[in-house]
């Protein structure tokens, strides 16, 4: 029998000897074992990567919680401005008292510590002072990228364009 004849199909198939069953069984066994080994290693590798990603996600979540706590502890611009105006007012009062003690012949000047004049109240609240938007302005102030903050604002159902205009007066603004 010619080897090329088996390929071309000009062979009487009744004359071809049967395949050895033990050899076929060995090939099938080898294929199954190697395939199972590959799939087990692949699944183990995937599981390892999932565990690693979960750890990274937990670390990121912990860092986010810490960052939110730090943001909550930062005073807002309104509180800082109030404290800054109170300190000069106190020092002006002390100067006035010292001046009146030193110069008894001259009448004391009528320098009353003036409280900062607030502009006439608008109909609403500035966006940066609004209770809903304050934490987002803090996040930008601390250094969180603005696109990420806008995405978070949108996920909470707020208008992200307000972040670009902090002095915008909101008619439906909420104060503390």
Curated annotation (Swiss-Prot):
Coiled-coil spans in chain: 47-74
Residue ranges of the region described as Disordered: 84-123, 152-176
GO biological process: actin filament polymerization; exocytosis; nuclear envelope budding; positive regulation of cell adhesion; protein transport
GO cellular-component term (any): WASH complex
Biased segments, Low complexity type: 104-115
Cystine crosslinks: none
Record's subcellular location: Early endosome
Pfam families, A to Z: CCDC53
InterPro entries membership: WASHC3
Gene3D superfamilies hit by this protein: 1.20.5.110
Keywords: Coiled coil, Endosome, Protein transport, Transport
The protein's assembly and partners: Component of the WASH complex.
Family note: Belongs to the CCDC53 family.
Task of the protein: Acts at least in part as component of the WASH complex which may regulate wash nucleation-promoting factor (NPF) activity and is required for its membrane targeting during endosomal sorting. During embryogenesis, not involved in the wash-dependent developmental migration of hemocytes anteriorly from the tail.
Protein name per UniProt: WASH complex subunit 3
Gene field: CCDC53
């Amino acid at each position: 029998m010619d080897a090329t004849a088996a390929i071309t199909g000009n062979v009487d198939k009744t004359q071809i000897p049967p395949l050895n069953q033990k050899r076929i069984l060995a090939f099938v066994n080898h294929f199954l074992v190697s395939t199972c080994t590959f799939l087990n290693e692949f699944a183990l590798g995937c599981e390892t990567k999932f565990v690693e990603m979960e750890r990274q996600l937990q670390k990121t979540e912990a860092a986010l919680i810490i960052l939110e706590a730090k943001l909550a502890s930062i005073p807002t611009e309104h509180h800082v401005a109030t404290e800054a105006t109170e300190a000069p007012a106190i020092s002006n009062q002390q100067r006035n008292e010292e001046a009146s003690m030193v110069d008894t012949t001259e009448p004391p000047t009528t320098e009353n510590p003036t409280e900062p004049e607030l502009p006439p109240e608008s109909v609403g609240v500035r966006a940066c002072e609004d209770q809903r938007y304050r934490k987002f302005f803090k996040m930008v102030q601390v250094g969180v990228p603005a696109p990420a903050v806008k995405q978070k604002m949108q996920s909470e159902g707020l208008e992200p364009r307000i972040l670009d205009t902090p002095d915008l007066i909101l008619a439906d603004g909420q104060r503390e």
